[in-house]
Structure formats: C-alpha cells, structure tokens
C-alpha cells in the first residue's frame, strides 16, 4: 500500500451484475430511450447500495459496493492463501498490455512499500472484502481452485450463514481478519472473476478547498444468479438490484441520486442486454487495462460540465493535485459550447438533470456509454 499519498486515498469498487433469468424477457418500452439498445430488457441486474446520510463522502448516494484499500490488502500474509499462484504473473491474473496511463495503484512496485502482493491483486482483494463487508456477498473459491476454469459466469458458493455473519462482523471491525477467515475456511478471494473496467479520480472542486478524494479502481464481475444481500446498517442503509436502464430512469426522475462515475458506467452497461454478452466483453478486454480519468469541471451560465480526457475542453496537462487548477468558469451557455462542435467527452448537468455527450473513440477496446435522452438534453 502506498503510504506516501498526499492528495487522495486509493480505493476499489465492484460492479456486481447477476443473471435474473435463463430466458428472455418480453420487450418493455423504457421511459428513458437508449437509441442503440437491443429490443429486449436485460436478463441481469446490477447491485447498488445506498450510502448512509451520515457518510462523509457522497451521503445518500446509490453506489457500487467498495471502499478504501487497507494495508491488510497488501499484507504478505496473503502469500500463504494464494500459495498455488505465487509464482505466476500477478497471481495468475496475467499482465495488462498498457501501462502508460494507468494509476500508480496498479503500476507501483509494491515491494518498495514492503509488500509482496502486486497492486493488481491487492485492489481486487479490497473490492471483494468491501463487497463482503457492505453487502454480505462473499466471492471466494476453494484453495485448490484452478483459475483457468474461471471463464464462465461466477457461482456464489453457499456458506454457513451464521458463520459468515460472525466473520463479516470481524472483518468490519478489523480488515486483516479477512486473511484469517480465508485461511480457516481454506478458500481464496476470487480475484480472477474481477475484470478491470475503469479508474476514476475524484475531481478537484475548487482551489484551496479540501475535500475527500479517491483514486478508485472499478472492477466488474458477472454472476450466474443473484446472491442473498443484507445491508450493514452502518455505511450502507439499503440496497437494490436494478437493470442499468431502470437505475438511470430512477435517477432521471429524481427518485435516487447516482454519482457521475456510476452514472457513466451504468450507461456503458446499457449496451448489453444478455449477461452472456457482457461477460464475453469483459473477458475479451480483461488485459487491455484502462486509463485514469479525473473529471475537470467547467461552470457555465446555465449548468455544469464535467469534462473527461479526449474532450476539446479538457486541459492538456490537468493538475491532478488541485494545488494550481481551479474550476473552469465560462460566461457561455452549455448550448453555445456544444454548437461549437468538436470532440465531446462530457457529462452535462442542467437543473440537476444529467446528459452524456460522447463522440470520441474509446481506448483499450472499451465502449462508450449509450447517451441518455433527458429533459436537460431537450434544452440544448
């Protein structure tokens, strides 16, 4: 774990997509239109957790399970748990092709911080541990598991509920207990089921104003069936399984609030109706990697624009630290900025209503979000 971080903390989150049916649903016309979406609804749902009102970061938001990377996620005690894979590159995860624009949480030499656990492994351990703490879903495999057999939808193994409940409380109190739990249960966190999806760095809100920031690795996994879920009544107050379209509909109608990264990623998922197609996509690009995105905010006359790398408004060399960079202010309307044309990779917020405008080519074999038709877009 990189203890030299000054401006943000490192975190990991997990998009849990679970099959809801082995057949096909009849097509239901959604209220929110996605122009390229197939004419059937998803046969899977995504888990979103509601953060506590008392949370110091994004209170009341619906987010994917996840949290801070702890020193125990990098503990060399994991070597014994993963003994079968110690000699394989990244414990059998393989080597990601692109390294230039990746976050240091992946590329930094963890041995310099006294750890034998690669960042690729530790971030996945964190995502699995936090998912267990917040939702009760435990993604583990037996100690004799063959990672090469992990190309299918994940099966969540039934465990003794009382035993798991006790371990969950232990891990919530002390994250290092996750190691002890795996040793006693003779299992391993199923790091091979988690495929790298994206990487978001909390934007700088304004110069001189300190706010909580996180460099967050987003992983995704596809489950063959929805597992049992229970909130922790601490950081998480409720949960819900949604199809990506349904979650965005509820956000559009102000029933829930979804932060920009989750909004963007749910919009990406709208490309995939069958979970098998989603799973095939994430497996095929699993070693392509991704670049870290930090939104740069532009304040316009009539709304806010979150610009992302590749957008014509995005700075060539953004100040990630926030020591120099301020929020960009413009005396133009959002419509005027759009009419100028060019490359768009931005999230527009007018009266709290979101619109994604994206016309750039995605990198690393990824996919752009399907743009949402909302009232704010009708104003443009």
Curated annotation (Swiss-Prot):
The keyword Ribosomal protein does not apply. GO terms for molecular function: coenzyme A diphosphatase activity; magnesium ion binding. One of its GO terms (cellular component) is peroxisome. Its cofactor is Mg(2+); Mn(2+). Its main location: other. It is found in: Peroxisome. A motif (Microbody targeting signal) lies at residues 378-380. Keywords: Hydrolase, Magnesium, Manganese, Metal-binding, Peroxisome. PANTHER family: ACYL-COENZYME A DIPHOSPHATASE NUDT19, TESTOSTERONE-REGULATED PROTEIN RP2. Monomer. Belongs to the Nudix hydrolase family. Fatty acyl-coenzyme A (CoA) diphosphatase that hydrolyzes fatty acyl-CoA to yield acyl-4'-phosphopantetheine and adenosine 3',5'-bisphosphate. Mediates the hydrolysis of a wide range of CoA esters, including choloyl-CoA and branched-chain fatty-acyl-CoA esters and at low substrate concentrations medium and long-chain fatty-acyl-CoA esters are the primary substrates. Highest activity seen with medium-chain acyl-CoA esters and higher rates of activity seen with the unsaturated acyl-CoA esters compared with the saturated esters. Exhibits decapping activity towards dpCoA-capped RNAs in vitro. This is Acyl-coenzyme A diphosphatase NUDT19. It comes from Xenopus laevis (African clawed frog).
């Amino acid at each position: 774990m990189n203890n030299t971080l000054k401006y943000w903390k490192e975190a990991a989150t997990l998009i849990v997509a679970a099959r809801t049916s082995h057949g096909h649903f009849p097509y239901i016309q959604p209220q929110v239109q996605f122009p390229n979406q197939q004419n059937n609804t998803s046969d899977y749902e995504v888990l979103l957790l509601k953060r506590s009102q008392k949370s110091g970061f994004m209170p009341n938001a619906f987010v994917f399970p996840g949290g801070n990377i702890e020193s125990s996620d990098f503990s060399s005690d994991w070597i014994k748990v993963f003994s079968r894979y110690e000699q394989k590159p990244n414990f059998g995860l393989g080597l990601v092709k692109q390294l230039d624009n990746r976050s240091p949480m992946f590329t930094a030499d963890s041995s310099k911080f006294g750890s034998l656990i690669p960042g690729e492994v530790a971030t996945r351990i964190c995502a699995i541990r936090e998912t267990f703490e917040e939702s009760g879903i435990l993604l583990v495999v037996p100690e004799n598991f063959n990672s090469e057999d992990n190309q299918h939808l994940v099966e969540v193994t039934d465990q003794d509920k009382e035993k798991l409940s006790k371990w969950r409380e232990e891990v919530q109190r002390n994250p290092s207990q996750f190691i002890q739990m795996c040793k006693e249960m003779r299992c391993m966190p199923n790091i091979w089921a988690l495929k790298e999806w994206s990487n978001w760095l909390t934007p700088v809100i304004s110069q001189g104003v300190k706010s909580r920031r996180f460099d967050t690795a987003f992983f995704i996994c596809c489950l063959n069936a929805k597992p049992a879920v229970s909130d922790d009544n601490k950081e998480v107050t409720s949960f819900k399984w949604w199809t990506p379209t349904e979650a965005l509909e509820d956000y559009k109608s102000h029933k829930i609030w979804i932060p920009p990264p989750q909004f963007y990623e749910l919009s990406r998922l709208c490309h995939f109706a069958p979970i098998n197609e989603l799973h095939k996509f994430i497996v095929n690009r699993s070693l392509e990697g991704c670049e870290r995105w930090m939104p740069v905010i532009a304040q316009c006359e009539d709304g806010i624009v979150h610009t992302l790398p590749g957008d014509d408004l995005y700075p060539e060399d953004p100040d990630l630290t926030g020591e120099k960079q301020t929020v960009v202010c413009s005396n133009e309307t959002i419509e005027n900025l759009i009419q100028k044309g060019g490359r768009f990779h931005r999230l527009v917020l007018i009266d709290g209503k979101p619109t994604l405008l994206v016309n750039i080519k995605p990198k690393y074999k990824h996919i752009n979000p399907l743009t949402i038709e909302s009232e704010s877009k009708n104003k443009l």
